[in-house]
Structure formats: C-alpha cells, structure tokens
C-alpha cells in the first residue's frame, strides 16, 4: 500500500504545485464528471489571512461534540497529504478524528487524474486535492464539512460549493 500511496503522491505533485491558472471551469467540469458530490454536502466555509486552521479545528470539534459527523479540509499538511482530509465522528470516542486512509486517498487521486486526463483537463495540485476531498466526504456521508480555502478569492477551487451554511472570515 505504501508504494501505491507514494505513486499517488508522485502523480499529484507532478500536476503543477506552483502552477496557477485562475478559474473554476476545470474543477467544475471534473466534479460534474464525478456526479457533483460537492452539491450533496453542506459547508462552513472559512477564509482569511491568519487563523483559518485554528478556526476550522475548533468549529469541527464543536460540531462533532454536537453529534455531527464532520468532514474537515485544511492545508497545508505537516507530514502526509492525508492530514488535510479528516472525518470527525461522534460515534467513535476512542479516535474522534480519522484521516483519509492512504488507500482511499490513492484510489481517488488516480480516479480523478484519469478522468481529467481522458477529458484533457489540466488540474492543479490543489484542485485535485479538493476534488478528492469532495468525493471522499460524499462517500463517508458526513453531515457537514468545515472547509478551509486554499489561496482564497473568487477563483479558489473551494468556491464551487452551493450549500454554504456559513462563511467565516478570520
């Protein structure tokens, strides 16, 4: 599994970590090809200059304590890409937070990159990660997503969401 995960990370990082092409067309098209999983979820969308990660962590914890199954999407990661995509579940008291497994992460990176490649869509690294997150949280049937923006602004890939319960600016 570790080798498959490393190959997924290699594919992900080859997609243009420092490549920026403003617009939501690419991510929107890929999400449409995936069945628009982002439209089946509800969000607390967190943006701002400083403190986004802290606000996201606190908000996700409060929602979990309130009995919600929470998807948490933050960046950057410290050790592994899987740290960015977590599920906080009130049903599991021993481990209230679970990172996406390397197996699920790899499967979704390969699936999304294959769809993008077949349709001549050139996604950035952040767009791929965001697509992985949307699909994974749909699969996990989370009640709500706490979503941290990437670069922020109108063309941030996280801005394709439609069911925004609350927008928070730090």
Spans of features found by a protein language model:
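Generic secondary-structure boundary signal with a strong preference for alpha-helix termini
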Residues: 60, 162-165
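Short gly/ser-rich anion-binding loops that grip negatively charged ligand groups
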Residues: 46, 53, 95-98
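ATP-dependent carboxylate-amine ligase catalytic core
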Residues: 24, 31-39, 65-162
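Residue-level signal for inorganic ion chemistry
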Residues: 12, 49, 70, 146, ...
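Gly-rich Lys/Arg/Thr-decorated short loops/hinges at beta-loop-alpha junctions or inter-strand turns
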Residues: 10-11, 111-114, 165-169
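Short beta-strands and strand-loop turn motifs
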Residues: 41, 148, 167-170
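Short functional linear segments
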Residues: 1-48, 55-61, 65-66, 73, ...
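Conserved beta-strand segments that form the floor/walls of ligand-binding pockets within enzyme
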Residues: 45, 86, 168
């Amino acid at each position: 599994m570790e080798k498959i995960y490393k190959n997924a990370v290699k594919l992900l990082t080859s997609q243009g970590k420092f490549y920026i092409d403003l617009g939501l067309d690419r991510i929107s098209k890929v999400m449409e090809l995936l069945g628009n999983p982002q439209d089946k979820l509800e969000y607390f969308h967190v943006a701002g200059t400083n403190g986004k990660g802290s606000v996201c962590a606190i908000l996700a914890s409060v929602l979990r304590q309130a009995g919600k199954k929470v998807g948490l999407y933050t960046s950057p990661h410290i050790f592994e890409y899987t740290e960015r995509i977590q599920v906080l579940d009130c049903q599991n008291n021993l481990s209230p937070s679970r990172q996406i497994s390397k197996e699920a992460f790899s499967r979704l990176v390969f699936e999304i990159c294959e769809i993008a490649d077949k349709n001549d869509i050139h996604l950035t690294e952040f767009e791929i990660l965001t697509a992985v997150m949307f699909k994974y949280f749909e699969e996990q049937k989370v009640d709500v997503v706490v979503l941290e923006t990437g670069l922020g602004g109108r063309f941030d890939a996280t801005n394709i969401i439609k069911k925004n319960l609350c927008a928070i600016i730090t």
